[in-house]
């Protein structure tokens, strides 16, 4: 009888707690962006204030949307520039273009775009090999990972990026390099938390990893992709499945940075992907290129 009563008490406590857990996050609004104005849009990137959005149009042009003015401007018509474009801490946009030379080799060139003057400045000469745009709290720089490991501009401020199976963390002008977990295909999508104390990144075969500034693993968040810091305590990420040929589902997840909690922000059938965060908002696209702006309320 005593054992039976204990089970009943446990079930009763679970029943009382479950509504609280279920309501820890609420989607308060979901708005389609640029409906009837832009066609399919991919690779969205919000700035930290959440008032500007980068995206690639169907024809590959990199575009900038200003939420306040409700205006879209073309940054460049290069078809690959939007794949890794980013906002620097100076407000400029850093991106890489790609060209085929007379020798039939592919060359990449780094640029930055000033949204106020609408001027593009070339930062590097065409380079055969990988060129990566790196955003920091004070601006941005261009990196050439691999054998030609180099920077074309000194990296100032704080930031994080990946090169192969290494995560690079810049803190106060000092660059630190870590390989905290084994990964058969390297790391991707590194970002620094808003308070500058932790770095989240994706490791192939491991999922999302959170480390401190000494490279020590503080949390493993699960098999999700494309992590983005929502605030110092939560990240937003993509959870996609495929059949080896195409996506079969994709949704946006909210993950607590210590790995203790997670929640679905939409259904797997929504085919939502590539989330980005800034200024308390979340923007994502769908497999069909539909942009959405989401707002949530987290009950802490």
Residue positions per predicted region:
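Bacterial N-terminal signal peptides that target proteins for export
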Residues: 1-8
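Sequence signature of WD/YWTD-type beta-propeller architectures
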Residues: 22-300
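Bacterial N-terminal signal peptides
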Residues: 8-16
